[in-house]
């Protein structure tokens, strides 16, 4: 792979185009509207989440919650001035937890269809002692401080803009000392969209960006 890799080639070879489209375009938002938040990221609405939690508590239980996460991670590396690695990883799934006394049941699914989520809920709820279905409260969104006040998401920065930045770092390192002959520079970033909903009615969403620039 040479240093002229295009964004189209990067997205195509890494199969991240659809994942990037699946994440909500809400840079710096600690909470989002229902239409542009959890539904866009996971394809679920509050009614479906309530049904899943109700299924988790069908046999009883003190509490149940469901955790959704959609993470897109990319990495670009430069060695001897040329791109030698470009990767992209996608993580998508949901976990259902049921608590009864000191017992906890947990099940996970990478498929976010209603059938798969209800199946995970049933598996997690199997630890309950069949004491009768417990209720699910009305959801109320919680707000939290914006710990990631970015003006531009990394997923919006094309490879054509990343490569020149890495080359500037490469040239600065080589120019800092004549004894430096070889430099490796890499940029890794990730964005996670998270949703947690509990049978007690708590509903929280978060967007978690991270980035790391490495030089050796």
Regions found by a protein language model. Name each.
Residues 2-216:
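Active-site bordering "gate/hinge" segments
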């Amino acid at each position: 792979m040479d240093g002229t890799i295009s964004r189209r080639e990067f997205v195509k070879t890494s199969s991240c185009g659809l994942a990037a489209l699946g994440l909500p375009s809400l840079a710096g938002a600690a909470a989002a509207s229902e239409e542009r938040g959890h539904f866009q990221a996971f394809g679920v609405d509050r009614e479906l989440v309530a049904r899943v939690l109700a299924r988790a508590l069908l046999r009883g239980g003190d509490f149940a919650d469901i955790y959704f996460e959609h993470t897109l991670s990319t990495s670009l590396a430069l060695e001897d001035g040329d791109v030698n690695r470009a990767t992209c990883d996608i993580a998508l799934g949901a976990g259902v937890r049921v608590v009864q006394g000191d017992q906890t049941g947990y099940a996970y699914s990478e498929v976010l269809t209603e059938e798969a989520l209800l199946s995970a809920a049933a598996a997690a709820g199997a630890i309950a002692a069949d004491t009768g279905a417990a209720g699910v409260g009305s959801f109320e969104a919680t707000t939290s401080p914006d710990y990631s006040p970015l003006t531009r998401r990394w997923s919006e920065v094309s490879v054509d803009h990343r490569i020149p930045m890495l080359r500037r770092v490469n040239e600065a390192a080589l120019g800092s000392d004549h004894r430096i002959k070889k430099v490796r520079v890499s940029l890794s970033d990730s964005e996670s969209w998270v949703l947690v909903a509990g049978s007690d009615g708590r509903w929280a969403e978060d967007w978690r960006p991270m980035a790391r620039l490495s030089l050796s």
